[in-house]
Amino acid sequence: MPLSRDPGALLSRSYELPSGPRVRLRLARPTDLPGIRMLLAERGLPATEIGLERLVRYEPRRRAVICATAPLDGTEAVVGVGAIELEPDAGPDILVVDEHVTDGLGPLLADVLVQRARIHTRRIA
C-alpha cells in the first residue's frame, strides 16, 4: 500500500484493514499508558513501569512511537504500538499489535514507522 510522503499525513487519517475495525495511527502520549499496558498484558509480554514510561516519553527528534487505536466496546482502545529510532535504514524496535482484532495492522504500522524515519532523516540531511 503506497503511503503519503508527508509524515503528518500518515497520522491524520484512519486506515481500513482486511478485517476488523478501522484504525487511527497517532503519536503515543502519556495518557496511552493504561492502553499500552493492557495490550502488552493481553499479548503476554512483560513490561516494567519505567519501560512503559520511557516508551511514551520519548525525544521526538530522535525517536517515533506510534499508537494504533480502534473503537472497541464503546471506547477508543489501543490495539497496537510501535517504535523506531529516527535514523537512516532503521527498522521498528518495538511492534506489538492485537492481531485477534486487527488483521493486517502489523505490516501497516511497520511501514508507517519506517517511512516516518526515512522522511525525518531526509529533512535533517
Regions flagged by a language model, labelled:
Residues 23-36:
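A short beta-loop-alpha structural element at the N-terminal edge
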Residues 1-20:
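Short acidic N-proximal helix/loop "leader" segments that mark the beginning
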Residues 46-93, 98-99:
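Acetyl-CoA-dependent GNAT
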Residues 22-24, 91-95, 125:
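Short aromatic/hydrophobic contact patches that present stacked aromatics
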